[in-house]
Amino acid sequence: AHCEIDVAVCYYGVGIEEDLELRERITCPLVMHFAELDQFVPEEARQKVSKAFEQRPDVEIYTYPGTDHAFNTPGRDSYDKPAAQMAHSRSIAAFRRALGPHHNLSELWDTHCYHEFVTRDVNATMATMVSEPYVNHIPTMTGGVGYDHLKRFYTHHFVNNNPDDTKLIPVSRTIGSDRVVDEMVFCFTHTREIDWMLPGIEPTGKYVEVPLVAIVCFRGD
């Protein structure tokens, strides 16, 4: 981190507490990920590191509760997927702040929703996604994994299956480095059966408002 690079990310940080006299040579943004139960970096060592960098706003230090050494390594017994994913998001945020690219994730998500609910164009909707997308509507466990399965779902059960007056009322939107969490109210008149939301329920003709939370992850460049 003191070799004139733009940004550095550190996992586990074994032995860092023994070389803290070199910290002034670190001039780039730095993110450190520690495991709470790591015997190689006990709490005392982590506290020394945190104390040494407490006046550095460009240094972020995270400890992941209940995790052990190598929590970020798939295939290891200590692998912890939730912690690894969170660490990945924080690392990506640091890299993008320093190096880019800088995407407008909110705009990308709006474009996706526009083609889902306004133009109702399956091909245009699919074009906003990665080559191997994944969608899961948790309450009914509907969606698709992979391009072909998801396109089939969108074509026969989603994009062309929503009532004509369907609309989204935004409530709150949280934007991270690699995801958007969108809270909204999904509004429609129940004029047709909606497979992905109310499967098996014949149209009632009633106006319906359903609160929804969409967690949208972004991959690639």
Predicted regions: what is each one?
Residues Y12, F34-E36:
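N-terminal Rossmann-fold cofactor-binding loop
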Residues A1-T27:
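Primarily recognizes the serine-hydrolase "nucleophile elbow" in alpha/beta-hydrolase
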Residues I26, V31-F34, Y64:
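Short beta-strand/loop motif that positions the catalytic acidic residue
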Residues F53-N72:
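Catalytic histidine neighborhood in serine/cysteine hydrolases
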Residues L37-V41:
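Acidic catalytic loop of the alpha/beta-hydrolase fold
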Residues I5, C28-P29, Q55-D58:
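A short helix->loop->beta-strand "cap" motif at the edges of active sites that frequently abuts
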Residues E36, H69-N72, R76-G220:
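C-terminal and inter-domain tail/linker signature
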